[in-house]
A protein has these predicted regions:
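Surface-exposed, charged secondary-structure patches
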Residues: 53-99
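Short beta-strand edge/turn micro-motifs at domain boundaries
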Residues: 93-125
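Short, low-complexity N-terminal intrinsically disordered segments enriched in polar/charged residues
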Residues: 1-22
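Short amphipathic alpha-helical segments, especially helix-boundary/capping motifs
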Residues: 5-9, 29, 78-80
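Short, charge-rich amphipathic alpha-helical segments embedded
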Residues: 40-57
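Short, well-ordered alpha-helical segments enriched in acidic and aromatic residues
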Residues: 26-39
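Generic alpha-helical secondary structure signal
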Residues: 11-14, 18, 30, 48, ...
């Protein structure tokens, strides 16, 4: 999703994280794919890839003290030549004391920035 120059601040990026998290909580995989795309879709349809990766992550979730609504974390990269600008981390509750991590990545140079679902992960087996 292409961002306006005014949408790269922490508040705006956190709002995109909330939107993505809400879509995932509702299991609206098509809506999430249509809005943000999916960097790790590879040869799969983005919505099917998001669903498969979410189900895989939910099968081995992160342990959390409270599965209640966690704040969105926005982290900015140091200036670089790779085009990486920011990371948006969203904890998504999948059960009592269990959550998966939904990550969105902001890439681009200058004013041309995009936000994309980067990964959905649980605990590595």
């Amino acid at each position: 999703m292409k961002l306006l120059p005014s949408q790269t601040d922490e508040v705006s990026l956190a709002a995109f994280g909330e939107e993505a998290r809400a879509l995932l909580i509702r299991h609206d995989y098509s809506g999430l794919a249509n809005q943000f795309g999916y960097a790790l879709a590879y040869e799969r349809a983005p919505s099917a890839a998001i669903e498969a990766d979410f189900l895989s992550a939910a099968a081995s979730p992160h342990k959390v003290a409270s599965a209640a609504h966690q704040p969105i974390a926005v982290k900015y990269f140091a200036p670089n030549d790779t085009g990486l600008f920011a990371l948006v981390e969203c904890t998504v509750a999948v059960g009592e004391g269990a959550a998966v991590l939904l990550e969105l990545i902001v890439t681009g140079k200058g004013e041309g920035k995009h936000i994309t679902v980067e990964d959905i992960s649980g605990v590595a087996a």
